[in-house]
UniProtKB/Swiss-Prot annotation:
The keyword Lyase does not apply. Residues 21-45 are annotated as: Disordered. Component of a complex containing fem-1, fem-2 and fem-3. Interacts with fem-1 and fem-2 (via N-terminus). Part of a E3 ubiquitin-protein ligase complex, at least composed of cul-2, elc-1, tra-1, fem-1, fem-2 and fem-3; mediates the ubiquitination and subsequent proteasomal degradation of tra-1. Interacts with tra-1. Interacts with sel-10. Interacts with tra-2. Required for male development. In XO (male) animals, fem-3 directs male differentiation in all tissues. In XX (hermaphrodite) animals, it specifies the first 80 or so germ cells to be sperm. Negatively regulates male development when bound to tra-2. Together with fem-2 associates with the CBC(fem-1) E3 ubiquitin-protein ligase complex which mediates the ubiquitination and subsequent proteasomal degradation of tra-1. The lineage of its organism: Eukaryota, Metazoa, Ecdysozoa, Nematoda, Chromadorea. The keyword Ribosomal protein does not apply. Disulfide bonds: none annotated. The gene is fem-3. It comes from Caenorhabditis remanei. This is Sex-determination protein fem-3. One of its GO terms (biological process) is male somatic sex determination. It comes from the Eukaryota. Keywords: Developmental protein, Differentiation, Sexual differentiation, Spermatogenesis, Ubl conjugation pathway.
Length: 439
């Protein structure tokens, strides 16, 4: 076939479908049909605006099934642990609750020693949470608590405060347009109390060495200027003279109480073990990923495989410390008979803040709701005993699509410079110019 043949084929008239011709002729002849069609289109658009979902559903049915199954497994364990912790689905406001990873970066200066997640799940029991609470109360001078209602009361109050902290952190992350909690939100919460912020820096953000107790390097000076906005008050914020006095006063009181009531028992290895362990630290010198995952599930936040659980665990120890310290002071102010506090002492000491203002001025936060920070916490009524009937509550999974979109946007921003520039050539003055332009 030659070029002339192709040109001849192109010049041939194209046959138009007869049906299209009839429709076009009918549309030109009938003006009412155009108005009817326009009305139908407007009605369809308005109906789409009314019934359009807030976020499009997940298109992959297999992925949706896997996530729903993962969610049901984790929430089943949450239901199991909630009989001990007292938490319900109404206490949780996690934006991602379908088993997605919420944290990638490091937020603590310490990490897990080894991965022991190979242990079977039936090795963990919800009584471990009660056991840790009992040993922490013992190490804080509240005595060897044999009353299960006391241990349950302290544990449930601690978990309620922790869930409130987690909700606050995620709200702060959403305000900062982040899809997960970063060190910025954690420091924003802890910075509400200067003494706790000092403890946080000392425990999780170690400088050049443990001997540098004044934190005089440039990094902590930057933290101070960023979160306190007062460069002139650096010595006041981080000086040991302001914070060690409070910490020493409470530590000395607890030590004197333990020494007076235990009679030298504090020197035994059993007491040191009770002083070191926590919800994620079953031993004295290591953290356990296995127990950290179970603690995540007890809080209702699967799976959160990150170091943030260490900070939440540290919060839990501080909360129990404050509860025990305040109850002991209140019990001695009321009775002064050398006995250990009972359940009624815990209820009254934590319900009425005005009973012991002088005892609370040393180290206890003066806020009636929050033992550590100035947050509004609705405890409601006292939790029922452990042996009461339990009503299982299920929760439908939320749609995490907007958080996936935010994740893609953040990943794109993080690699934007790498996509347009070669870092091997960006040295010296060129890199400073790019940073100055805000790229």
């Amino acid at each position: 076939m030659t070029c002339d043949d192709f040109r001849a084929e192109d010049e041939q008239p194209i046959e138009v479908d007869e049906r299209r011709r009839r429709l076009k002729r009918k549309a030109n002849d009938d003006d009412d049909d155009d108005e009817t069609v326009r009305e139908r289109v407007d009605d369809a658009e308005s109906s789409m605006e009314v019934f359009e979902a807030e976020y499009p559903p997940i298109l992959d049915p297999l992925q949706d099934q896997r996530e729903a199954k993962y969610f049901r497994e984790r929430m089943q364990r949450f239901d199991l642990y909630s009989r001990t912790t007292g938490l319900s689905v109404d206490d949780i406001d996690w934006p991602l609750i379908r088993g997605r990873s919420l944290q990638k970066g490091r937020v603590a200066g310490i990490s897990f020693v080894y991965d022991d997640t190979r242990y079977p799940i039936n090795r963990f029991s919800d009584t471990w949470l009660l056991c840790v609470t009992k040993q922490k109360l013992f190490s804080f001078g509240a005595g060897c608590v044999e009353d299960l209602n006391i241990t349950s009361f302290v544990l449930r109050r601690t978990m309620k405060v922790l869930s409130t902290y987690c909700n606050w952190l995620f709200e702060a992350a959403k305000r900062n347009n982040r899809r997960h909690i970063t060190h910025k939100e954690i420091q924003e919460l802890i910075n509400r109390d200067g003494f706790r912020f000092h403890q946080y820096l000392q425990k999780f953000l170690i400088g050049r060495g443990m001997e540098y107790t004044e934190y005089n390097n440039r990094f902590f000076k930057y933290l101070h200027e960023e979160y306190n906005k007062n460069p002139g008050g650096l010595e006041t914020i981080y000086s040991n003279q302001d914070f060690i006095a409070k910490e020493t006063a409470q530590a000395n009181y607890i030590y004197d109480t333990v020494r007076a009531k235990y009679g030298g028992f504090e020197e035994l290895p059993l007491f040191r073990h009770a002083l070191k362990i926590s919800f994620t630290q079953p031993g004295e010198h290591y953290f356990s990923r296995f127990y950290a995952k179970r603690f995540h599930e007890a809080l209702g936040c699967p799976p959160l495989d990150s170091e943030i659980i260490m900070i939440l665990d540290w919060f839990g120890v501080l909360i129990m410390n404050q509860i025990a310290y305040k109850t002991i002071r209140w019990h001695e102010e009321e009775y002064n008979d050398g006995s250990f506090p009972v359940l009624d002492s815990y209820h009254k000491a934590l319900a009425d803040e005005s009973k012991c203002p002088k005892a609370c001025l040393i180290s206890i936060s003066l806020f009636p709701d929050d033992p550590l920070f100035d947050l509004d916490i609705d405890y409601g009524t006292n939790p029922p005993p452990v042996n009461t009937a339990y009503q299982k509550v299920r929760r439908t999974p939320r749609d995490p699509t907007p958080f996936y979109r935010l994740m893609e946007f953040e990943d794109y921003k993080s690699c934007l410079v790498k996509m347009h520039f070669n870092f091997s050539e960006l040295t010296g003055e060129w890199l400073r110019k790019i940073c100055a332009r805000g790229r």
